[in-house]
Swiss-Prot record:
GO terms for biological process: translation. Keywords: Ribonucleoprotein, Ribosomal protein. It comes from the Bacteria. The keyword Nucleotidyltransferase does not apply. HAMAP family: Ribosomal_bL34. This is Large ribosomal subunit protein bL34. One of its GO terms (cellular component) is ribosome. It holds the Pfam family Ribosomal_L34. Coiled coil: none annotated. It comes from Blochmanniella pennsylvanica (strain BPEN). Belongs to the bacterial ribosomal protein bL34 family. PANTHER family: LARGE RIBOSOMAL SUBUNIT PROTEIN BL34M, MITOCHONDRIAL RIBOSOMAL PROTEIN 34 FAMILY MEMBER.
Amino acid sequence: MKRTFQPSILKRNRTHGFRVRMSRRQGRKILSRRRSKGRVRLVVSVLNIH
């Protein structure tokens, strides 16, 4: 049986990346919440995976 998680950096960034977050109203809300909470990493990026 095939596993459900097949990692792809491109798909990950297109769904959860900074540019996508900024392009949508709800995404900007997510970023502001994470900023106010004091998160070091606001979004998932290629650098955060390694």
